[in-house]
């Protein structure tokens, strides 16, 4: 099975312009993401998908591969579709979508999501990662997307609110969504033809589109958190963790 990992990266960000190139311990953030992903077993190729020449030059400077995408891509999945088309991937090829602001991604987590497709070929077209929340402040923070899943680890819902709600107790596990996706090339094509979902639009969570239209999202629970860098203040947290990693 061919497995291509794509790292979509945009230069523009309202909260943190130039985020992919922000230095973390002497390297641009996108380099940390790329190099940690490269440690995962089972990958055929890794590309950064971007529409910005500054990011392209930075990636090529450390020896990474880049595919230039349409600057007018409406969403992250549209950018992935553009990259897949340019790379000429086959319908049954596996595509991993790793966000460019996850410099702490653990390669074992990437291997987990590949294993899901190896063990259950043809049973689903999309999978993602979850992590049991250990920091209390994340429980009610809408920045941290929560998720629930059934006994077969099929996603039931994603929300910015705390789910599930414990009517009589607060002592129960709550899982957050880690922004890593895997799908077959064929499913990406299917997904991009689906109309915007009502819940997707309400929560501003693109993955809800798949659930709203009856598609299965398989979940793997990671033993490793992968916090995203959303603000310059998050850089200090990453630097401290990378220093001891």
Swiss-Prot record:
Q: Which keywords, in A-to-Z order, does the entry hold?
A: Cytoplasm, Lipopolysaccharide biosynthesis, Nucleotidyltransferase, Transferase
State the Gene Ontology BP annotations: lipopolysaccharide biosynthetic process
Q: What class of enzyme is it?
A: transferase
Where is this protein localized, as stated in its record? Answer: Cytoplasm
Catalytic activity, EC: 2.7.7.90
A single Pfam family it belongs to is: CTP_transf_3
Reactions listed under catalytic activity? 8-amino-3,8-dideoxy-alpha-D-manno-octulosonate + CTP = CMP-8-amino-3,8-dideoxy-alpha-D-manno-oct-2-ulosonate + diphosphate
Q: Name one GO molecular function term.
A: 3-deoxy-manno-octulosonate cytidylyltransferase activity
Single GO cellular component annotation?
cytosol
Record's function text: Activates KDO8N (a required 8-carbon sugar) for incorporation into bacterial lipopolysaccharide in the Shewanella genus.
Family, as annotated = Belongs to the KdsB family.
Q: What is this protein called?
A: 8-amino-3,8-dideoxy-manno-octulosonate cytidylyltransferase
